[in-house]
């Protein structure tokens, strides 16, 4: 269940009526009081806060924010979604630089829609919000399990991860599937789960919000490591690229000394040792496959942050 907290201005009877109609169809809570808002955030810990119009409250960092401007003029850059009441309002918000704008009409204002249709569309937006940036929603068990599953998938043999199993049960299969799909590693994750004898992930269609110009990365398996480092340098770090480098390092098709010479020729020494450190952390590559020692330096810190943030809006 998605926990939605509506917050709205006092003395706005139309918005109050609209929210209560939604609450009859979508399980949620609502308040127009700043103190009650703080209490609900602390005690109930909502997944989504849906702001309706202008409210005098401080942002709650742990929840995902959706806003219905109701006439407010802003780009709302820090919101997951902006809900316009009409296509005209949506166009005006886009002119202000708004993104992730959805049009959901208010049945109290227009007869073009009814409340059931409106509630269904609203719930779809809430689900898209919760499908977005899935890594941020991972619990510690999922974060612990992911490298082991991927490593088992890469090697195709659970003996490579015997000292790390049993791993925690997958309690977030949907989030894990969405994450793997967006990172281009779903087939590998499926293989790892099969190797470990774990329950397959449900392959269900989903919609989510993505950063502008984001494209699901594709595998470059078979490419040489220097080319993959060049790809990271130009386009940023991704899980699939780490997997591809891991696969290349454990293959018999390269010579460590020759590889290090090519890395140096292309001025990728610092990048390479940092990428090795990330592979060690994220995929548990065994030390025997390292052609040189990984390093945890300032570039590693940046790459680590980029890997966690590149799906964020």
Could you tell me what each predicted segment is?
Residues 1-32:
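N-terminal subdomain of nucleotide-sugar transferases
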Residues 31-51:
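An amphipathic, basic-hydrophobic alpha-helix
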Residues 41, 66-84:
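A conserved, positively charged/aromatic
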Residues 51-56, 69-70:
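Short His-centered aromatic/hydrophobic patch
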Residues 80-101:
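A short, active-site helix/loop in glycosyltransferases that binds the activated sugar's phosphate group
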Residues 104-113, 123, 245:
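Short beta-strand->alpha-helix junction loop in the catalytic core
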Residues 114-136:
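C-terminal alpha-helical cap of glycosyltransferases
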Residues 128-313:
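Conserved NTP-donor binding/palm subdomain of two-metal-ion nucleotidyltransferases/polymerases, i.e.
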């Amino acid at each position: 269940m998605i926990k939605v907290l509506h917050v709205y201005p006092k003395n706005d009877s139309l918005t109050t009526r609209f929210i209560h109609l939604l609450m009859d169809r979508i399980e949620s809570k609502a308040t127009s009081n700043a103190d009650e808002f703080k209490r609900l955030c602390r005690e109930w810990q909502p997944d989504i806060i849906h702001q309706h119009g202008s409210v005098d409250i401080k942002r709650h960092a742990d929840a995902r924010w959706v806003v219905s401007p109701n006439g407010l003029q802003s780009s709302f850059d820090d919101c997951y979604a902006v809900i316009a009441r009409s296509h005209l309002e949506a166009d005006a918000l886009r002119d202000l630089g708004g993104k992730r704008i959805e049009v959901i009409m208010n049945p109290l204002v227009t007869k073009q829609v009814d409340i059931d249709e409106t509630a269904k569309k609203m719930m779809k937006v809430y689900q898209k919000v919760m499908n977005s940036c899935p890594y941020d929603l991972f619990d510690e068990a999922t974060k612990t399990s992911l490298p082991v599953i991927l490593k088992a998938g890469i090697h195709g043999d659970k003996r490579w991860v015997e000292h790390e199993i049993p791993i925690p049960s997958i309690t977030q299969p949907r989030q894990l599937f969405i994450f793997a799909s967006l990172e281009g590693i779903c087939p590998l994750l499926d293989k790892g789960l099969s190797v470990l004898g774990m329950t397959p992930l449900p392959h269900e269609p989903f919609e989510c919000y993505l950063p502008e110009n984001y494209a699901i990365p594709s595998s470059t398996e078979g490419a040489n490591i220097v080319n993959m480092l060049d790809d990271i340098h130009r386009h940023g770090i991704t899980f699939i690229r780490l997997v591809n480098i891991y696969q290349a390092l454990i293959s018999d098709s390269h010579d460590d000394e020759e590889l290090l010479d090519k890395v140096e020729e292309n001025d990728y020494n610092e990048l390479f040792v940092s990428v090795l450190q990330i592979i060690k952390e994220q995929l548990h590559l065994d030390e025997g496959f390292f052609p040189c020692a990984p390093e945890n330096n300032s570039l590693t810190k940046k790459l680590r942050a980029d890997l966690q943030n590149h799906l964020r809006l």
